[in-house]
């Protein structure tokens, strides 16, 4: 392997000459052999956007030459596009400020820009990783800015569309099933009737509320720390840098990023991402409920509830021929469990900042992005391979409806709660129908039962 010598404030170190990173990245590789977690493409892209925007603004403010700006922008564009992803090798489990990954981006952009200019990698000429690429920045404000860029893009580009896709499919099912009457269940026990469409409308509403929750948290994610530098004072930045840089990032992404009004909060705390993670946890809880309902309703096919059928996607057992399992519900419930667990880590990280800097930044963004990705992919998979293929089993639905003792509730206004309860208990004890039980007890006639117990009149408000 051909190497070159890179330098930093600690001296010289050999680096694989085929790589664009420099001394600080190399030292991090030596010191943090921890797990397999690497920063995802979303964070690398965000750092590229940030470095490009900073160069544009620094040039606009007269702090960076036009030639240097062009070189940095060209190299940063390659980072943004993903062309240089292999040159970002660092573990998530590193310094809590993300300093090594910030320097990784500075070094890669510097060396690639030097190469574009026809220079020698590692020379730091004509583009210096600190003086030029990192101008008017500190890891303490760049890394949280990249965190917010990455999270905001993924919430907008992946999670919201995935939730909408699933919601729309459930809305179609709600309309399709609006006239199919079934027995309700509370406490896992029989309850009064509703329609299958009404049941599915609950899922639609959950998803609509969750989409609204994501949109409600976005304004706090749009607030950027850039311009705070080391502790929030803005040391070594132009007075206009923070606002202009946020505006440039907004232009690059098409999202309404703004400069955080208080940089001390933006560096020392990550309450906005803790809040975001809480929203993701809420979505996970909703999806857990929906996925569980679907697999219970489809259980069987002969010895379970079996009121709906779901697509048969793959064999379900290596020993039981013909078995098909609710695998999409299972992936979704596992994803939900993981997202809830991720939120615990984010909460601990968010609560553990000290004085002017939170040093759990990589942990926080790793888990937030992981939760967004898991929820997004899970919703798309569930919609494509399960939700859109759900069909009602009308025979089973009618069987359960007609067998339910809870239809007796319709008799309450006519014969009173106590007498209705007697009919239900007697029918259950003797294995008869409600109608037979009521007639036997002399509490109603056949005609009265037929007039009063009408499931189709029990699915909306009524005092008749």
UniProtKB/Swiss-Prot annotation:
It is found in: Cytoplasm. Signal peptide: none annotated. Homotetramer. The gene is fumC. SUPFAM superfamilies: L-aspartase-like. The active site is at 187 (proton donor/acceptor), 317. One of its GO terms (molecular function) is fumarate hydratase activity. One of its GO terms (cellular component) is cytoplasm. Belongs to the class-II fumarase/aspartase family. Fumarase subfamily. This is Fumarate hydratase class II. Its main location: cytoplasm.
């Amino acid at each position: 392997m051909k190497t070159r010598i890179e330098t930093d404030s600690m001296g010289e170190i050999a680096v694989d000459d085929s790589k664009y990173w420099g001394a600080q990245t190399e030292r991090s590789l030596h010191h943090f052999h921890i797990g397999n977690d690497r920063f995802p493409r979303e964070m690398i892209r965000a750092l590229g956007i940030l470095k490009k925007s900073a160069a544009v603004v620094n040039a606009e403010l007269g702090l960076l030459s036009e030639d240097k700006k062009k070189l940095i922008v060209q190299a940063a564009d390659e980072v943004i596009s993903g062309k240089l992803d292999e040159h970002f090798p660092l573990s998530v489990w590193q310094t809590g400020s993300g300093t090594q990954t910030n320097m990784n981006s500075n070094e890669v952009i510097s060396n690639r820009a030097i190469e574009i200019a026809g220079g020698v990698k590692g020379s730091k000429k004509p583009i210096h990783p600190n003086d030029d690429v990192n101008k008017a920045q500190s890891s303490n404000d760049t890394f949280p800015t990249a965190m917010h860029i990455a999270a905001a893009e993924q919430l907008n580009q992946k999670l919201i569309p995935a939730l909408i896709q699933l919601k729309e499919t459930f809305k179609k099912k709600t309309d399709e099933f609006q006239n199919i009457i079934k027995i309700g269940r509370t406490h896992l026990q029989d309850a009064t009737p509703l329609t299958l469409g009404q049941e599915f409308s609950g899922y639609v509403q959950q998803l609509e509320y969750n989409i609204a929750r994501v949109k409600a948290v976005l304004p706090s994610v749009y607030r950027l720390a850039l311009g705070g530098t080391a502790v929030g004072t803005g040391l070594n930045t132009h007075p206009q840098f923070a606002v202009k840089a946020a505006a440039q990032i907004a232009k690059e992404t098409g999202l309404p990023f703004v400069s955080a009004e208080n940089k001390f909060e933006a560096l020392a705390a990550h309450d906005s991402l803790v809040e975001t993670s809480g929203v993701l946890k809420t979505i996970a809880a909703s999806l857990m409920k929906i996925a569980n309902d679907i697999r219970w309703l489809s259980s069987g096919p002969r010895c379970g509830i079996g009121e709906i059928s779901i697509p048969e996607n793959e064999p379900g057992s290596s020993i039981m021929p013909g078995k098909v399992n609710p695998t999409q519900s299972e992936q979704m419930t596992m994803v939900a469990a993981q997202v809830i667990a991720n939120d615990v880590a984010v909460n601990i990280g968010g609560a553990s900042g000290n004085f002017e800097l939170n040093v759990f930044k990589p942990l926080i963004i790793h888990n937030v992005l992981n939760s967004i990705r898991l929820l997004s992919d899970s919703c798309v998979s569930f919609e494509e391979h399960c939700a859109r293929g759900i069909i009602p089993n009308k025979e089973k639905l009618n069987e359960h409806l007609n067998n339910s003792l809870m239809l007796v509730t319709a008799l309450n206004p006519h014969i009173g709660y106590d007498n209705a309860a007697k009919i239900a208990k007697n029918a259950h004890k003797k294995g008869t129908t409600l109608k037979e039980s009521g007639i036997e007890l002399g509490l109603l006639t056949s005609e009265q039962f037929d007039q009063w117990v009408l499931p189709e009149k029990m699915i909306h408000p009524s005092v008749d």
